[in-house]
Amino acid sequence: MGAGEKTAAGMPRIGMGTAVQGPKPDPIRRAVLRAIEIGYRHFDTAAHYETEAPIGEAAAEAVRSGAVASRDELFITSKLWCSDAHRDRVVPALRQSLRNLQMEYVDLYLVHWPVSMKPGRFKAPFTAEDFVPFDMRAVWEAMEECHRLGLAKAIGVANFSCKKLETLLSFATIPPTVNQVEVNPVWQQRKLREFCRGKGIQLCAYSPLGAKGTHWGSDAVMDAGVLQEIAASRGKSVAQVCLRWVYEQGDCLIVKSFDEARMRENLEVDGWELTEEERLRIAEIPQRKINLGKRYVSEHGPYKSLEELWDGEI
């Protein structure tokens, strides 16, 4: 099983995602506990998901039951929401996340988007008045303070373009360990992966299956004919082919299913490989970004177009 393999930074290659529509604390607590029992060790949450508390409860329960010896066996990622992306709000925001998790530290703390909003703005839809300019240096200096205080073992970003990473690296004292972005066979991120590899930044893939069923997701990945043909010829599911492809790129992946059979299937990425011919066929899939982040773009806000948000990398 692939859940145990780790990156150089000690992050398990496969993590369980917990972004859900609407709070569902009890089902999440039960699903996370079951995931720990079947081998998951990496759990991905965020202040914005409102799933930190049930993850913390499941982790505590897993320690009590002996499913893990201690919290240290788990790798917990959380994220700074846009309304707290201000110099004086970053450390307090992480402390609140830690209270929610009932933990003393997170293994990884990410800037969720390169976006700042007025304090208190949590739920879409957002208006132009909600956005304020993103002071990357101020936010990152506060993220570095989280690391120095021992509240976050590692720090990183999410949804950053090559250009934004270049800017961040120009002044960061502690460079980002991870950039968590959308990666799947329909949005392969070749340019960003090459850039991150050259800078020692680990790419972590969210929505490796295209996030079908979410408000912004798409069927484009699971319905791709090439992937369906490869899956049929190999006796695998389309999901397994997608996850194997992402895994072979060297990325970490965040998978989300609360169904036990699927949770097990999503761990089965090793023990087989795509052939060179299959990889070439996947490389030819027409590319289009699924999670555009349109809600962060406003004609009177800091990002007036998707081109500006992604620096043309779409």
Curated annotation (Swiss-Prot):
Catalytic activity: 2'-deoxymugineate + NAD(+) = 3''-deamino-3''-oxonicotianamine + NADH + H(+); 2'-deoxymugineate + NADP(+) = 3''-deamino-3''-oxonicotianamine + NADPH + H(+)
CDD domains: AKR_AKR4A_4B
SUPFAM superfamilies: NAD(P)-linked oxidoreductase
Binding residue positions for NADP(+): 44, 158-159, 180, 258-266, 273-281
Active site, per annotation: 49
Top-level EC class as recorded in UniProt: oxidoreductase
Residues covered by region (Disordered): 1-21
InterPro entries: AKR, AKR4A/B, Aldo/ket_reductase_CS, NADP_OxRdtase_dom, NADP_OxRdtase_dom_sf
GO (cellular component) term, any one: cytosol
Keywords carried by this UniProt record: Iron, NADP, Oxidoreductase
Annotated positions binding substrate: 112
GO MF, one annotated term: 3''-deamino-3''-oxonicotianamine reductase activity
Gene3D superfamilies (alphabetical): NADP-dependent oxidoreductase domain
EC number: 1.1.1.285
GO biological process, one term: response to iron ion starvation
Pathway membership, UniProt: Siderophore biosynthesis
Domain of life (superkingdom): Eukaryota
Tissue: Mostly expressed in root tissues, observed, at low levels, in mesocotyl and embryonic roots, seedling roots, crown and seedling leafes, mature bracts, anthers, pistil, caryopsis and embryos.
Functional description taken from the UniProt entry: Catalyzes the reduction of a 3''-keto intermediate during the biosynthesis of 2'-deoxymugineic acid (DMA) from L-Met. Involved in the formation of phytosiderophores (MAs) belonging to the mugineic acid family and required to acquire iron.
Stated family: Belongs to the aldo/keto reductase family.
PANTHER family noted in UniProt: ALDO/KETO REDUCTASE (PTHR11732)
Record-given protein name: Deoxymugineic acid synthase 1-D
Organism: Triticum aestivum (Wheat)
Gene from which the chain derives: DMAS1-D
